[in-house]
Swiss-Prot record:
Protein name as catalogued: Uncharacterized protein YejG
Lineage top rank: taxon: Bacteria
Pfam families noted in UniProt: YejG
Highest classification ranks of the organism: Bacteria, Pseudomonadati, Pseudomonadota, Gammaproteobacteria, Enterobacterales
InterPro entries: Uncharacterised_YejG
Amino acid sequence: MTSLQLSIVHRLPQNYRWSAGFAGSKVEPIPQNGPCGDNSLVALKLLSPDGDNAWSVMYKLSQALSDIEVPCSVLECEGEPCLFVNRQDEFAATCRLKNFGVAIAEPFSNYNPF
């Protein structure tokens, strides 16, 4: 197993779903008051590196997840490459990425800062 040093990802706060007729190739955000069913997706966005190099890093991360049979897709979201995984696979995906040497940025709040 290789590692990707200095790669940091964070989970985008919104949930997504496949666009009708575009499963695997196009996503749309789920409204905040909408139901998050079993088919909802989470997006992991790369914080570093950025630019053209980000796409190759995201494809390597996608391959790392494919190696453990976690389905995922690398698609553009908010102008950046994002890795989309099924919501029920989020913990397996982040565990695999951590084992692969990727740092996962976690949100902080005033109520639970650490």
